[in-house]
Amino acid sequence: MPELVLADRDERDDLGAFVARAVRLDAQAVVRLRNREDGRLLDAWVATPFDTLATRTVAGRVEPSDVTVAGSELLTGLTVMRGERIDPGAPKDLMWRSALPPVEGWLPVDRLPVGVVSRLADEGVAVARENTGPHGTPPASLLDQTVLTVSGSGLDVKVPLRCLFALSGMGFLGSAEEEEVRVIATDAWLRIDARFGAVVRRRHSMLPLLV
């Protein structure tokens, strides 16, 4: 069975908040846990309903070093088990169906005020409520609309509304409007780093990849 060890209570609470948000957005969400090469940090990944990935890094380690578990079971383990070692639940690796971005090759593009990003997200939510589809969700055409274009390091990067929805829905932005989010990119990927986590998405549409 998988085993999760976190550095301290703060790291447990941080990961718990991340998983709770993911489960709130999608009760069937799975979380992929991956150790960093340094052995001291691990990355938690989740595929959001907005067709973006969300990630949070915490101090700790998991065995095996790359495992996918049910978000609801992981949340239970983080909430109930107060000892050093946590049972994150049974492995569900076959349920992870998203490609992960590369570790290296990222270039800095721009920094944006949190207040600006929050307002754009709020405006998008208001528009989405008026344009929900038959299943009660915004149409893909709305989510794919570019709300920001940023430039840097020789790259022009378009930020779609769905990325801002994911940042807001996962609670990554916080309430300090004077803070900034960082936009970085590769030729194929876009990443927006905020105070409490990051949202990642392919810059160009392509067929889904299985990993």
Describe each PLM feature range.
Residues 36-39, 71-75, 204:
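Generic N-terminal initiation segments characterized by hydrophobic and/or small/turn-forming residues
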Residues 1-58:
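N-terminal ordered "arm"
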Residues 45-46, 53-61, 199-208:
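Short amphipathic beta-strand/extended segments with alternating polar/hydrophobic composition
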Residues 52-87:
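A broadly used, surface-exposed interaction patch
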